[in-house]
């Protein structure tokens, strides 16, 4: 839950800055849930393709983020908006795309954080008491760095989707431009999260050593 707080706060901020009409709760909730569903599809696709890049070492990891993770995750989050909210008459302004994009990103981030923490928290830590708190806290902090990125870049792509809705003559190029911008920024966010992961992991190891001493 704590790992999602920054993403929730950012999504709430995007919602509050909508200077047009307030978006209906039904569309916001539906978009959030679709963001959760599309996250599962992205997770499967990422898992299938990752081994092909793993053989290339660090270069493969970078390529994987830019060629697969960014485009796939930003596309499915935009799909979460396109499937329902976009088709509703209440999606009646360009900035609505930003709000719904942020909600799709929030849904994606929440389920991704939950899956990541469940997978990464070692089963052996369950018997260690304070060790569990330390490990869980470290992972939570790492995921807290990643969550806002999903909201930000999904909101950017959503803005372009809003532009596309009201510029039917250039709809395709506008949507592609938005996805490309978000897909390029996303791996940069992942790299930042990776640096944070290393720092937090090092702090946790040092703390454990200090307790032992």
Name each model feature, range by range.
Residues 1-213:
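Hydrophobic alpha-helical segments at protein termini of multi-pass membrane proteins
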């Amino acid at each position: 839950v704590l790992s999602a707080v920054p993403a929730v706060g950012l999504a709430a901020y995007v919602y509050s800055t909508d200077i047009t009409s307030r978006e209906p709760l039904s569309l916001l909730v539906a978009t959030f849930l679709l963001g959760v569903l599309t996250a599962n599809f992205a997770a499967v696709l990422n898992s299938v393709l990752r081994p092909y890049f793993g053989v290339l070492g660090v270069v493969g990891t970078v390529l994987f983020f830019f060629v697969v993770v960014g485009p796939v995750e930003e596309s499915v989050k935009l799909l979460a908006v396109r499937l329902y909210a976009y088709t509703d008459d209440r999606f009646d302004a360009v900035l609505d795309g930003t709000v719904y994009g942020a909600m799709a990103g929030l849904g994606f981030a929440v389920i991704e954080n939950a899956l990541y923490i469940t997978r990464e928290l070692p089963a052996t830590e369950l018997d260690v008491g304070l060790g569990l708190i330390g490990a869980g806290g470290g992972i939570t902090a790492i995921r807290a760095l990643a969550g806002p990125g999903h909201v930000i870049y999904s909101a950017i792509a959503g803005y372009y989707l809003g532009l596309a809705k009201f510029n039917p003559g250039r709809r395709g190029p506008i949507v592609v431009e938005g996805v490309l911008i978000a897909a390029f920024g996303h791996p940069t966010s992942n790299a930042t999260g990776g640096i944070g992961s290393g720092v937090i992991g090092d702090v946790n190891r040092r703390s454990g050593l200090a307790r032992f001493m």
